[in-house]
Structures are given as structure tokens and as C-alpha cells.
């Protein structure tokens, strides 16, 4: 990369097969040996920077911790905070580990010196391309115990089991498209007389739930939210629960929601959706309840009152409700539009790269736009801090 030496560490056969640029070495032992292994690599190659995708996995944390001690710069890629045409690239950490401040005044002041961003250059990223990448990467997973005996996946289920459940759920999603679209039409049509709140589900296996919230899984989130809604929301309001589009279907959320609704005596006030058009729901809802999903950012784009139950980079006074969930249902506070505009521009300027991970054009854009960010002496966030 621009004359820089790159040394990659492979942890699985998928890593090995996917990398053809050279300079790779395989780590086959257990995670307990990683701190010493990384220290050896740092010393041998005089490492100045490390590059990760995500920063919560067991194979990543020892590298991040060592980098902090050694004064090595950490560049973390992640899905975009403002999708679909941006990816995240931050120094130090992403999401709840981000270095972005939580002070609204800082965003208002910093916004004066950054450009006004639109949605970025667009590109097409068909889902089948992403699925193909995933299948090709995991095709070799069954051989990992033989060639990488120390590796333990951060995902709690095997690729084969995951794909089988995806197939089953895809059939369910196809069957539910028309009924769910009709449910959305009815809910939206009646929203003036029967306001609704929206709870978009996240993936239980996501690091956002496991590391950046106090919830153990989405079942815990559902029970907490429905219990609070039943006890504290106005009787004429509805709670709409929408499943995550990439949920593999290990948990029957529809059955769970029905069971909890019966338990809390709100069966006629809860609507469960397996699929559906999220922007339509966001355009008419009275409020959004999320743990820390990027849907929270989309809710702010739609000027929706929003509460984040976990640790989210957008959770701050003026953007999200700062009180407890029990109070949220009756104390609706819309986000400050001007603050959100400033927040969005600053976040894009300091952490977002125009591009994508799952199609050739998007990848080429991301690489081209990421190189100057990674090779700069100071990050955009550091430059803003110096100006302040």
C-alpha cells in the first residue's frame, strides 16, 4: 500500500484462501497466546499501524490493547454509521469504543469547519454478491480444527447451521412479504388515532449487543421493552417490532413476542413484522426504541424521537432521549434538527469513507478513499481537536 510493508495474520483457512497479496503468516494456537505473539510481530517488524475489521473479537482485543501500550496507531474498519454508501474507518476504535465526543456543543462548533456532506457517490451492491463472498469464505470452515486447531469463532453457531436456518427463514420472509406490507399499511394509516412505537431488532450475536450493552441477547431486550411498554405507554398506542433482515432464524421471535404480549396482556397492542419497508415505518412512528443499532441513526435522519438502551455513538443530549425507558413512552422529545445536521457532517468528515465492502466497485472506492485517511499523520478527528 503506497510503499508500506503489510504483514497479515491468518486465523482460518478462509483467511488464507481470501488473501493473495503475500506477507501473511498463520496463527494456529489458542487465543491465550496472542498477546505474546503480537508482541513478537510488533518487535520483529517494527509495526507502526494495525488494521482491523471490527474491534471486539477475541483475536482483536489483544492487538488493540498492545497497540495502546506501544503507541501504535489502530485503524478499525466497520459497517458505515450512515449507510449504504459509507463505511466506517476510525483510529482507536468504533461504535462505543469510538473517540468521538458526546458533547453537543463540540459538534456545533466543529461543524463550522467541515464540509456539508450528502449521501456519497452511489454504487450497486447486490445481496447475492455479499452472500457469495460469505459462502466462499466459510466453505473451508470444516477444516479449521485440523489446520487451525486453536481457533474459536466469535459466532456461536457453525456456518452450515447458519446457512440452513437462513434458507428456512428466507422462505418465511417470502411468505410474509404481502401480509407484513398490509400490516404496515394499516398501522401507518391509523397512526393519528393509534400512535405506534418501533422496536427494530438487532442480531443477538452482534458485538453491539454482547459488548456495548447490558443485555445478554435480543430476548432480554424484548422482555424489557414489552414489560415497560405494557406498564407505562398510553393505552391507545401500539408497539411494532420488526425483525432484522439478516437474522438467521435460530430464535422464533414471532412466537416469543406473542408469548410476552400474552404475559403482559397487550396482545392487541403489539404488531410483529418479519419483513417490511423500514423508511415507511420511520416516517410515521411516534418513537424508536433501539439498543444501539445504526437504525437509530436512520431514525434521527427521519426526525424520530429515539432512545438508545445500550452504548451508542449517537446517544447524547439533543439527539436521543436521556431518561429511562419507562419515561420515554410519555415524554416524547424530537431530536434537534440543526444539531443532527452538524453531528452527521462531523461524523462523516471524521469517521466515514465513501465505499462498500461487498461489491467490486464499492471496494475499489473504499480502498481509494481509505488510503489517504490511513497514511495521514493526524486523523480528521485529531485535526479538529487541535483547532479547538
Regions inferred by a protein language model and the residue ranges of each:
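A donor-sugar binding/catalytic signature common to diverse glycosyltransferases
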Residues: 49-59, 274-320
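Donor nucleotide-activated moiety binding/catalytic core segment of transferases
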Residues: 29-45, 245, 250-294, 301
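Active-site and donor-binding regions of nucleotide-sugar-utilizing enzymes
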Residues: 11-107
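Structural motif
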Residues: 48-49, 196, 238, 287
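Leloir-type glycosyltransferase catalytic cores
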Residues: 100-146, 319-388
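Conserved catalytic-core segment of nucleotide-activated headgroup transferases in glycan assembly
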Residues: 148, 152-256
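N-terminal subdomain of nucleotide-sugar transferases
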Residues: 1-12
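Active-site-proximal region of nucleotide-activated glycan assembly enzymes
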Residues: 75-174
Amino acid at each position: 500500500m503506497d510503499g508500506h510493508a503489510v504483514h497479515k495474520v491468518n486465523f482460518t483457512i478462509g483467511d488464507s484462501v481470501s488473501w493473495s497479496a503475500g506477507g501473511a503468516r498463520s496463527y494456529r494456537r489458542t487465543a491465550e497466546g496472542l498477546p505474546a505473539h503480537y508482541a513478537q510481530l510488533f518487535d520483529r517488524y517494527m509495526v507502526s499501524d494495525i488494521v482491523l475489521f471490527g474491534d471486539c473479537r477475541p483475536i482483536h482485543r489483544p492487538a488493540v490493547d498492545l497497540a495502546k501500550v506501544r503507541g501504535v496507531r489502530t485503524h478499525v474498519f466497520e459497517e458505515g454509521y450512515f449507510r449504504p454508501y459509507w463505511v466506517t474507518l476510525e483510529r482507536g476504535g468504533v461504535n462505543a469504543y469510538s473517540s468521538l465526543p458526546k458533547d453537543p456543543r463540540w459538534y456545533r462548533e466543529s461543524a463550522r469547519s467541515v464540509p456539508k456532506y450528502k449521501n456519497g457517490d452511489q454504487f450497486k451492491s447486490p445481496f447475492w454478491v455479499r452472500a457469495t463472498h460469505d459462502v466462499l469464505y466459510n466453505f473451508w470452515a470444516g477444516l479449521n480444527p485440523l489446520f487451525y486447531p486453536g481457533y474459536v469463532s466469535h459466532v456461536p453457531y457453525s456456518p452450515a447451521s447458519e446457512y440452513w436456518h437462513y434458507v428456512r427463514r428466507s422462505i418465511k420472509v417470502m411468505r410474509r412479504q404481502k401480509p407484513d406490507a398490509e400490516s404496515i399499511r394499516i398501522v401507518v394509516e391509523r397512526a393519528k388515532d393509534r400512535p405506534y412505537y418501533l422496536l427494530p431488532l438487532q442480531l443477538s450475536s452482534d458485538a453491539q449487543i454482547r459488548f456495548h450493552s447490558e443485555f445478554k441477547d435480543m430476548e432480554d431486550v424484548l422482555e424489557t421493552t414489552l414489560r415497560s411498554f405494557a406498564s407505562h405507554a398510553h393505552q391507545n398506542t401500539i408497539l411494532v417490532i420488526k425483525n432484522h433482515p439478516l437474522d438467521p432464524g435460530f430464535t422464533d421471535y414471532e412466537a416469543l413476542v406473542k408469548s410476552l404480549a400474552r404475559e403482559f396482556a397487550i396482545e392487541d397492542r403489539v404488531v410483529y413484522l418479519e419483513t417490511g419497508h423500514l423508511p415507511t415505518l420511520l416516517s410515521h412512528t411516534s418513537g424508536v426504541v433501539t439498543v444501539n443499532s445504526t437504525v437509530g441513526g436512520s431514525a434521527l435522519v427521519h426526525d424520530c424521537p429515539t432512545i438508545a438502551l445500550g452504548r451508542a455513538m449517537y446517544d447524547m443530549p439533543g439527539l436521543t432521549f436521556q431518561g429511562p425507558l419507562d419515561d420515554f413512552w410519555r415524554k416524547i422529545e424530537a431530536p434537534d434538527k440543526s444539531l443532527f445536521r452538524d453531528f452527521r457532517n462531523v461524523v462523516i468528515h471524521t469517521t466515514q469513507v465513501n465505499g462498500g465492502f461487498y461489491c467490486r466497485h464499492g471496494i475499489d472506492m473504499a480502498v481509494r478513499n481509505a488510503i489517504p485517511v490511513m497514511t495521514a499523520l493526524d486523523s480528521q478527528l485529531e485535526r479538529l481537536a487541535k483547532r479547538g
